[in-house]
Regions:
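C-terminal amphipathic alpha-helix
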Residues: 32-53, 113-152
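Charged/polar positions within long, soluble alpha-helices
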Residues: 54-61, 65-68, 95-109, 133-136, ...
Length: 152
């Protein structure tokens, strides 16, 4: 419903073709009754984990500050490796999500057959669940690393 309302507000020419183009362009974002249920499931997982990207960026910044502090004040600290590992895990999950987002839309738009789209969506559902798990794990590792080190 919001896609249609959005299109009505933004369709200055009022043509049906223009509205259809807008609906196609924005159906990927809204996922409302235009895409198959499996697509909507995938987008629900995406929408669930996307806000965590901010958490990842915040944790990466905190870890970078700790690493910089260690290198200046305690170059032989045993914690440096822990911070670097946690940062690498966050970078991996960030890269996985970014790569998935770019690949998903590009690939989905090129598939024309319903069976091909379904196969693709089955594969992508597993992939986004894996990314979700990686993000949760990397956030947990980084949070625990920051919390369990005596450095302030």
């Amino acid at each position: 419903m919001s896609v249609l309302l959005w299109n009505c507000k933004n369709d200055k020419a009022g043509s049906d073709a223009s509205t259809e183009d807008h609906m196609h362009d924005h159906s990927m974002v809204s996922g409302e009754n235009v895409q198959p249920p499996l697509f909507n499931e995938i987008m629900a997982v995406h929408d669930e984990v996307m806000p965590r990207m901010k958490d990842i960026e915040d944790l990466k910044e905190q870890l970078r500050l700790k690493i910089d502090s260690i290198e200046v004040n305690m170059p032989d600290s045993k914690y440096k490796a822990d911070f670097r590992f946690a940062l690498a895990e966050l970078n991996r999950s960030d890269d996985m999500m970014t790569d998935w987002m770019h690949h998903f839309k590009e690939s989905y738009d090129t598939i024309s057959s319903p069976a091909g789209k379904n196969d693709f969506l089955e594969f992508e559902r597993a992939k986004i669940e894996q990314i979700k798990g990686k993000m949760e794990t990397s956030i947990k590792i980084a949070s625990q690393t920051l919390a369990n080190t005596p450095m302030k």
